[in-house]
Structure formats: structure tokens, C-alpha cells
């Protein structure tokens, strides 16, 4: 799993740093954006193995951004995991139905979070 590039699209700097530090400690390379629009450009340019997408971003929301990624030939095969602090607003079933490949609630259960990442990266490499 190590050395895979993961794009983190999260507008909260503390959350972004926490996720980045966790992933880098596990050997992943990370790329970060605090806005969906910039994240879409980075995804197209760098083709990460996985995108972690906050749902409630300022500006374009995470659901709209994910749908644009899935609609683009350049990024449609990159798995996108929804990450949200709002378990009441967005549930796993509705986020997967929207088109996300995975779903995690912040704060993360570390073992579930890493297992989901491993599953999605394996899926993207096959």
C-alpha cells in the first residue's frame, strides 16, 4: 500500500493535517486542497490512487465535485471516499447511492478508515 498518492480535499486545516499525518505515517504520499475546484484540477493533473473528499466544503460541495470527477474521462476511475463530520445529515447508504466509493465519519475509527483505504486502492489498481 505504501507510496500510493492520496488526494485530500478538506477545507478544515486541522482535519487536513490530521489526515495527512496519519496517511504519511502509514507510508502514503499525500496531496492536499482546501477547495473542490482546486482539488478537481489536482486530480486531473496528478491522477491519485484515491481521493478523500469532505462533503461540506465551502464553495462547491463534495457531492457536486465527486460527480464532476466521475463524469470526466480523465478521473472517472479514481475512487472517491466521502468524509464527513455530520453522520446525521449524510448516511453511508445515501452517499454510496450518490456515487461515492467509500464513506467515513470524522473522527475516524482508525482500523475501519485504513481498511477502507486499502480496499479502494486495491480496487483502483486492478
Question: Residue spans of the language-model regions?
Answer:
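Charged docking surfaces used in two-component/phosphorelay signaling
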Residues: 17-25
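Acidic catalytic/metal-coordinating carboxylates
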Residues: 14, 35-38, 61-67
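The short loop immediately C-terminal to the conserved phospho-acceptor aspartate in CheY-like receiver
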Residues: 56-58, 81, 86
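Conserved acidic carboxylate
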Residues: 10
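The feature encodes the CheY-like receiver
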Residues: 58-61, 76, 88
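Short hydrophobic/Thr-rich beta-strand motif most characteristic of the beta2 strand and flanking loop
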Residues: 27-34, 42
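Active-site beta3 strand of CheY-like receiver
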Residues: 46-52, 57
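Short amphipathic alpha-helix used as the core "switch/output" element in two-component signaling
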Residues: 41, 63-76
